Structure formats: structure tokens, C-alpha cells
Amino acid sequence: FSPPSSQNPAVIDCLIVGGGPGGLTAALYLARFRRSCMVIDAGSSRASWIPRSHNYPGFPPGINGNDLLARLREQARGYGARLEQGRVEHIEPHADGFSVRYGDATCVTRRIILATGIEDTLPDMPDVEQAIGEGKVRLCAICDGYEVDGDNVAVYGEAENAISHAVFLRTFTDRVTVVVHGEPNACDQAFALAEHYDIRV
């Protein structure tokens, strides 16, 4: 890892697109490596939906997603990371790296980290956002499997992917049903797996 550049200080060493836990952790490390960095955050991190996360290290009783984001922002800022609200709309090559437009502003950066995460397709049901906030609807089997211990669980989604998640959730409960979005098109192997683990489709 080379020492910080002494080139044009108006050029950011690294721009991070996305202000969720991944993007903010990258900003923290870059700032501690004495690199100039900026996070552009559209404010739509999945973490903000989490009522309480129990699998983020260092918080034994768990932590609310928005509280976690606030702590990560504070820590990154404390080392000099710059955090901006906005949505990146255009990136193009530049003599010093890349020119990036976000909202009415532009910046030039030597490197870019894309930490945009994923965007969930929410089920078409009333009050789904409230249900997520209450922990009744969950978006991540890996993150939340432990919390469904012994409960009745419905996995909603495209058949093959939903069956895969349902098999994982059988680690925590034997009462798993797959609710298929659209036609139940899945390979024979996926249906055989569901039958083997006594998962209703």
C-alpha cells in the first residue's frame, strides 16, 4: 500500500457510492489510511429497515439499524471521511481518474468503490414496511434465521431461490412453507430438495 499521493488535492483519492455498513466501513479504513475519501449516500440502506440486528459484532444485546448507521457515520467522520447525501447519476473517465456527477454537484476521484448493496422487491401486501419494522417480515434468511426458531415461516419469492432459502431456514424451524411469486418454475432438483426437507411449496 503506497503512501498518500501528493498530487492535486482537489482530486479525491476514493469516492464510495453507497452509505450502508459496507460503504461506511470502507470510508473508515480509507480515512485511517490517510486517504481523502467521500461517501455519496442516497439514504436507502437496507440497514435502516432493521428493527434490531443481533449479528453485528460488538453489540451483544443487538442494535437498531439506524443506530448502527449513525455510529458508523460518526466514526468515519471522526477520521476525516466526507459524507454527502445524493444519488450518483453519471460517471465518466477523467485525466485524473473519474468525473462523477451527483445531483447538482460534480467531483473528480482517482478510484471508486461501489457499495450500493441490493434493492429488495417487496411483496405486494398491505403495510409491508411497518411489518418489516416490527420484524414480522424479514428480508434476509442469513441475518434473521436465528430469530425464527421454531416458528411458522413462509418464504416468498421465485420458486428455485425461495426453496434454497427455505432449506437453509430448516436449520431453525421445521415449519417452512414456500409461497411462490408467479409460476412455480423450478428444476426437478429444487422440488426434490423441498420434498426431502418436508417443505411445502
What residue spans do the PLM features occupy?
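N-terminal glycine-rich anion-binding loops that anchor highly charged ligand groups
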Residues: 36-49
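General small-molecule cofactor/ligand-binding pocket signal
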Residues: 82-84, 138, 179, 200-201
